[in-house]
Each structure stands twice: as C-alpha cells, then as structure tokens.
Amino acid sequence: MLFRFSSSFLESISTHVDPKLPFISLSKGLELNTLRTMSTIIPRPVGNRRQPFVVLSGPSFAVELMNKLPTAMVVASKDNKLASSVQQLLASPNLRISTSSDVTGVEIAGALKNVLAIAAGIVEGMSLGNNCMAALVAQGCSEIRWLATKMGAKPTTLSGLSGSGDIMLTCFVNLSRNRTVGLRLGSGEKLDRIMGSMNQVAEGVSTAGAVIALAQKYKVKMPVLTAVARIIDNELTPTKAVLELMNLPQVEEV
C-alpha cells in the first residue's frame, strides 16, 4: 500500500476492522505531510489507539522468497507476545524470523535505506568507483543511525537485519528499484522519464522529500541523504552533489 493512500484506505475499511485484529505492515516509507511511519498512521483512521501492530522488515526480495531461497527477517512490535506469535506464524525452513520491540528503529531504517540506495545507485551510474561507494554507504548508515536514535531507536537495531542487512541488499543488488532509480539519475536521465518508465514503486523517491524536514526537526546533520532529496527536487545535479560532499569540512569520525 502506497503511503500517500494509506490513511484514506484505512478510513474506508475502518468499520470492518476488528479492534483486536493485528496489522502486519510490510511498508517501508514515511507519510510526507506528517513524517509518520505506518505504526503511527494506522490508529487514527481505524479509530483505535491500541490497534495491535507488527512491522515485518529486513533484507528480502519477494522473488527470492517465492523461490524458497534462504532468507532472514525481523518482526517488531511493542507487544512481545504478538511479535512471538507472528514469528511462529511466518517462520519456515526457508525463512528465519527474529523478534524486536524496537518498532521505531525497524521502521525508520526501512524507510531511509531506500533513500540511501538511490545515492548508491547515483555513485554507480556516475562510475565513481568502489572507494566512493564504500564511503558514501558508510556515511549514509551513520546518518540513518543518528536520526533513528534521536527518534528513540536502539543503536543495535540499526546494525541488525532491518538496518545494515536491508541497506546492503538495497544498495548493492540490481533487483533494487531504488538503486535502479539512482543509477539512471547518475547516468544522466531525468527523474520524470525514469519514473514514467517504471511499473513498480520506488518508495525512496517520495521518502526523500521527508529527509530534510526530519533532519531539521531532530537537529541532525545528514549531508548524503539530504543531497539525494535535493537531487530529487532538481535543486542539485549529481555532479554538484559530489563536489559539495567532497568539500565538506574535515571532521572526526563519530
């Protein structure tokens, strides 16, 4: 379900929703006008602040799951018993499921890794090399961690399946839609042309619009991810973005 349609869709079905029915979210994004994740979107339109909720995330391409290739994911819920129940429901010989109570960390990592994947694709499209790719992704991981922890996430979540695991998959594998968008941007294509030619959604494009607002709200410096947002908004070209990033003040690594 696309984030921009989620509230209206949930309102349309609210009278049919059992207040004890758990929602399992696979969405990885943010609602642009509110900066909310799915766990905070759902309660209002369904009219139940205590609607049971679980988020399922981690490094997983659907085609590989369908082909029964080994996969590991994480389910996060503030209700530990619910998380365990979903774990038992979904686990199989080909799918390992870990549990977490850090809903914020899992959701924020899942949303922002899509923006970082666009950045990784841009580096690939511009043929900037492996050194640049490694530095950019490392910096992007730090930016996601800085923001997520400011929002209440656990640092360990960002190094787990929903953080580092999903980031590696999305940034480095050709099946990634967001990486593909970045690769084509880095190769010189215009965003409108790219989006018009795709028959699937690249959530990182819309999520990028929330990055600058989040960075300002939580007072976090996020030069890589905000550069992607500015490229998406046609405020910056990929070439100028690289020059800006390389000319940032030399700092101590944190």
Where are these regions (language model features)?
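Conserved residues at beta->alpha junctions
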Residues: 1, 29, 77, 172, ...
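Rossmann-like NAD(P)(H) cofactor-binding subdomain of soluble oxidoreductases
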Residues: 1-68, 86
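Generic structural signal for well-ordered, non-membrane alpha-helical segments
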Residues: 6, 31, 35, 39, ...
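Internal alpha-helical scaffold of NAD(P)-dependent oxidoreductase catalytic cores
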Residues: 8, 16, 41, 45-52, ...
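General beta-strand structural signal in soluble alpha/beta enzymes
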Residues: 25, 51-57, 97-101, 160, ...
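Alpha-helical transmembrane segments of multi-pass membrane proteins, especially transporters
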Residues: 55, 134, 138, 162, ...
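NAD(P)-dependent Rossmann-like dehydrogenase/reductase catalytic/cofactor-binding core
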Residues: 120-124, 149-159, 163-254
